[in-house]
Swiss-Prot record:
Protein name: Phosphoenolpyruvate-protein phosphotransferase
Binding site for Mg(2+): 435, 459
Phenotype on disruption: Cells lacking this gene are unable to grow on sucrose and fructose. Severe reduction of the growth rate on glucose, galactose and maltose are observed.
Protein location: Cytoplasm
Gene name linked to the record: ptsI
Miscellaneous comment: The reaction takes place in three steps, mediated by a phosphocarrier histidine residue located on the surface of the central domain. The two first partial reactions are catalyzed at an active site located on the N-terminal domain, and the third partial reaction is catalyzed at an active site located on the C-terminal domain. For catalytic turnover, the central domain swivels from the concave surface of the N-terminal domain to that of the C-terminal domain.
NCBIfam families: PTS_I_fam
Residues annotated as signal peptide: none
Amino acid sequence: MTTMLKGIAASSGVAVAKAYLLVQPDLSFETKTIADTANEEARLDAALATSQSELQLIKDKAVTTLGEEAASVFDAHMMVLADPDMTAQIKAVINDKKVNAESALKEVTDMFIGIFEGMTDNAYMQERAADIKDVTKRVLAHLLGVKLPSPALIDEEVIIVAEDLTPSDTAQLDKKFVKAFVTNIGGRTSHSAIMARTLEIPAVLGTNNITELVSEGQLLAVSGLTGEVILDPSTEQQSEFHKAGDAYAAQKAEWAALKDAETVTADGRHYELAANIGTPKDVEGVNDNGAEAIGLYRTEFLYMDAQDFPTEDDQYEAYKAVLEGMNGKPVVVRTMDIGGDKTLPYFDLPKEMNPFLGWRALRISLSTAGDGMFRTQLRALLRASVHGQLRIMFPMVALVTEFRAAKKIYDEEKSKLIAEGVPVAEGIEVGIMIEIPAAAMLADQFAKEVDFFSIGTNDLIQYTMAADRMNEQVSYLYQPYNPSILRLINNVIKAAHAEGKWAGMCGEMAGDQTAVPLLMGMGLDEFSMSATSVLQTRSLMKRLDSKKMEELSSKALSECATMEEVIALVEEYTK
């Protein structure tokens, strides 16, 4: 009998294949009283070391398949394993209570998980709880001599079905064999969804109970376009899904033909389509997908992948490689955005109740502790500027005085280099990321002093709606098309244009096919997104009329009260 489920369409594509249940092993154990505590400590050390090596191998594979940025999630896992305080506490329980390593590990990690999960208003700490859970499973499996599931060993075409996919699971997926995956939980912004889109594997998440309904080897039909999953599809349904898959493949082939085309609308207006990157290795994907620029280079990954602060020369080489790889096309480099969910093992960040609203990004750069790091990065960028078209962007700016302070340091380092006889490019644009509502509201004043704006919608939306996008209980409030968000964005674009400056966007919204027509109508100049979204967005823009999109955005801004009304209006104008 055919059963149909509906979930969240998290990664586009269609697949029909047998189910592969990714079941976690039984990690239950008995608490034992032991006399030889030294032996238990040695068992713990061995399990930690093996887990560390295993994670490094998984990360190395993930770098190859997903890229440096997506693979950086494993750094957080390895930091948990290397945490001397946690290890010391586990060993203290072994010695004080005379219990086996399994019991001590579970007691200490459960304590940390409970504390972090209790911080319901703090997404960063809740993510750390998820990291500890993933790591605990791995260490416990090694202590028990149990094998964890290994998606890397799959050697036939399957659709993975799981409660959820951990980052380490997703990093092992080979899209030659894994045709899609479906989970009980998760959404479009979860790690597994982001990785699925990077790998271009169809995914449907948040089905609630698919693991209870599916058996190993059962035939499934999955649409990452609509969020539909059919169990035991009929011959007719299989045919419909195959047709939908063929149509999507044909559509992708049409998009690929636009690689070297200009992004021009039906009425001849040009918009710049750019891509976001995390490392120099990502430049190849930018060029392969025909992006006209890099709209966001997240430089913090240079710091997160190092054992100590990267030197000026190390940074110079990285920036030079990116600029040269783009062959004169614009590259917007964001200065380091550490803090929040991005920590460094060699830089002591304070434990804060809410690090996303705390000491991070430019706030660190402008502090006494961060001044040296900031100046080193600016010098490296200025030296590299002669190798391409560099633009520099400061993140997390709330005050005009913050921008002035950062620009003053930039000017000082530029003057020093020139005095030293080091060549520096002329006309480097210096702008800010608009991700704090205060900056969006004061955009008219910022526009008098900056060279450009880049709107970071991921944070702007959650800060404006007072809703943590990782908290499922309030995820309904994370609304990119809410009229309040659209009005803020419009305010920023109009303020930039009033001063003869350009405005771009580098959040997820820039490649959102519902948002793009609205943003076109508002006059957004540059759209920066994941490289794999560039060609689809170019195809959409080429069939739209910019004047008609201006009518659309004007109506949405003046007449709509809800997100649903905005979506209906977009559908009416773009059908």
